[in-house]
């Protein structure tokens, strides 16, 4: 089927990147959950797509949490930094197949992004403005590092959330010791207390988290074990792998 597009979209293509279909779908699914659910801040309603030579970085945040995925591309491309609406990415994720052999062509222009795959073309306006300074939010410092089985940790948190109403903000308390981590949650429906085996480097710590935020991140991580980095009870923690291909 012949498709006609506005001339300005064709003329203003200034850059192109190529990414496997499976990789793009995975990257979107692993970041889309932490965009802002409303449009109160337009930057938080989109995701940063940043190409630096052969590296693609995708970032989303909602004011409470941040998701970052770093992907190595096959070739080197012109450096580009744009903000793509989350609604566009959600729709693309739905129609992208899981084929890792086929590729998605991604065209960037000053005001638009164009995705081309499987005889399908998706064009979207970009969100105008400068994205947040992500590097200022990230720190490599930590006082405590916990390595834990991801499935056991996720299963335990999901059991705990049975005791919480949807809008209840009861924190999940993590009490980190030498070889174990205690998980505690109290609500009007009851209480939960569980203990998991861990490998710890650094100090003991007791810290509370929104269990939903942990669940959202853990569900999209494929690793069998995860590393959690913590500074103190009032600072954010980071879940990331050794190569920083993902950071939550």
Descriptions of predicted regions:
Residues 1-248:
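Structural preference for solvent-exposed beta-strand-turn elements
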């Amino acid at each position: 089927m012949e498709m006609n597009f506005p001339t300005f979209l064709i003329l203003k293509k200034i850059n192109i990147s190529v990414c496997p279909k499976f990789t793009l779908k995975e990257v979107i699914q692993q970041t889309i959950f932490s965009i802002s659910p409303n449009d109160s801040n337009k930057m938080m309603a989109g995701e940063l797509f940043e190409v630096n030579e052969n590296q693609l970085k995708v970032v989303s945040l909602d004011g409470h949490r941040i998701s970052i995925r770093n992907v190595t591309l096959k070739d080197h491309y012109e450096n580009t930094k744009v903000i793509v609406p989350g609604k566009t990415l959600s729709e693309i994720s739905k129609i992208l197949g899981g084929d890792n052999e086929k590729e998605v062509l991604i065209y960037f222009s000053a005001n638009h992004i164009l995705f081309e795959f499987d005889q399908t073309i998706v064009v979207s306006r970009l969100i105008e403005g400068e994205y947040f300074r992500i590097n200022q939010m990230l720190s490599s410092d930590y006082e405590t590092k916990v390595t834990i089985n991801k499935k056991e940790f996720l299963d335990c948190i999901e059991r705990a959330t049975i005791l919480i109403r949807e809008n209840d903000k009861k924190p999940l308390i993590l009490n980190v010791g030498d070889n174990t981590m205690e998980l505690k949650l109290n609500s009007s429906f009851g209480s939960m207390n569980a203990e998991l085996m861990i490998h710890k480097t650094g100090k003991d710590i007791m810290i509370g988290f929104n269990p939903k935020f942990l669940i959202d991140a853990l569900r999209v991580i494929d690793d069998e074990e995860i590393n959690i980095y913590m500074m103190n009870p009032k600072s954010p923690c980071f879940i990331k792998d050794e190569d920083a291909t993902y950071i939550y």
